A protein has these predicted regions:
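Phosphate/nucleotide-binding beta-alpha loop and adjacent structural elements of enzyme active sites
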Residues: 1-347
Length: 347
């Protein structure tokens, strides 16, 4: 195999969750709220015939750009916990735009704080997820991703009834520090996701910032500022949750959770699902055998030591951090949520 082909395999963006072999004619339904940059990993690796996508983006310019990209159905709405009128602050860096005012005394401790300064304000009318569902503008959603710079909890509150009945998973941006005035923090979002929606936390992709400094090159990690948290429907309560649905819907939800756990690399979760005592209530024996073979195949990786080697790990970890990308030296983030298979390695 030549070098270029090897590199092509190494950086192949295909995701093993979206194989036609395990789609069984079903599609996972994704709701992406705050979709400015388009569909993110791992969902961006799915084929059109395995995924239905609804993108929600209140910024009219960005919503038009998403429509032109034809990634899915675009709803140019602002979502909240009630139908009301809000002011959207369009900041110097559009990705920091929010209905919350920036907390400048906090942000000015770090570099490049001016990107949070508002250059324009627009008035937006908000809707709630529960209202959209009642009006049939959205149907059965399996997975939701929310990234709206502080407004995540309000959106979850506005869709509590719908989300409790439909979600198998949630990826949501959470803040550990008050980047915006009066915004909810991780503890608030986490409590709501667990207690109100019945989900459980599985992973967090964390982002760190370093205080402004000009004389010395500091260590890589700074203060934990924000992250992307992944929540999944618990195995322990899954059968009870699914049993309240009709046969078609419960089978779809079971399949969506299987695909989601594979997509994020939680194969132990996938295995627990398909080998559970209740799995055959929601998947036939033939499809179950296909899934078992698929998991057996994709779980294989390069494991030279059955329990690892702490000395070699430490050496490679030091080398890895020496080359880790940063944002101008003062901000860095973990690569992704969950585990991702690259070439013959799970990372």
């Amino acid at each position: 195999m030549n070098i270029s082909k090897s590199l092509g395999l190494l950086f192949d963006k295909k995701n093993i969750a979206f194989s036609k072999d395990i789609s069984f004619g079903k599609k996972v339904c994704l709701l992406d709220v705050g979709a400015r940059d388009g569909i993110g990993w791992p969902w961006c690796t799915a084929q059109n015939n395995t995924l239905n996508v609804i993108l929600v983006e209140p910024d009219p310019i960005e919503a038009k750009a998403l429509e032109d990209q034809n990634q899915g159905r675009v709803l140019p709405y602002a979502l909240w916990n009630e139908e009301t009128e809000l002011t959207l602050n369009i900041n110097n860096s559009p990705g920091t735009s929010s209905v919350f005012k920036p907390n400048m005394p906090f942000l000015q401790q770090f570099e490049d704080s001016q990107r949070f300064e508002a250059r324009e304000e627009i008035i937006i009318q908000t809707k709630t997820i529960d209202t959209l569902a009642q009006n049939k503008e959205i149907d059965s959603i399996d997975f939701v991703k929310i990234d709206v710079q502080g407004g995540e909890l309000a959106i979850l509150q506005g869709g509590e009834d719908f989300f409790k009945k439909n979600l198998v998973g949630l990826e949501v941006e959470v803040e550990f520090c008050p980047m915006y005035r009066d915004q909810p923090l991780f503890s608030d979002v986490d409590y709501f996701a667990r207690v109100n929606l019945g989900l459980e936390l599985w992973d967090i992709r964390k982002t760190y910032w370093k205080y402004s400094q000009h004389e010395y090159r500091m260590p890589l990690k700074g203060r934990l500022i924000f992250g992307d948290a992944l929540y999944l429907r618990p195995v322990a309560t899954l059968d009870f949750w699914l049993s309240s649905m009709d046969k078609k819907k419960s089978s779809q939800k079971f399949h969506a959770l299987v695909v989601t756990t594979i997509a994020y690399g939680f194969l132990d979760y996938t295995s627990a699902l398909i080998n559970s005592d209740f799995s055959e209530n929601y998947i036939n024996k033939e499809d179950k055998e296909v899934l078992i073979k698929h998991i057996s195949k994709i779980s294989k990786s390069f494991y030279p030591f059955s329990n690892g080697n702490k000395y070699l790990y430490r050496i490679f970890q030091v080398l890895m951090h020496s080359f880790k990308p940063t944002y101008h030296g003062w901000a860095n983030a973990e690569q992704h949520i969950g585990s991702k298979k690259t070439f013959n390695f799970w990372v």
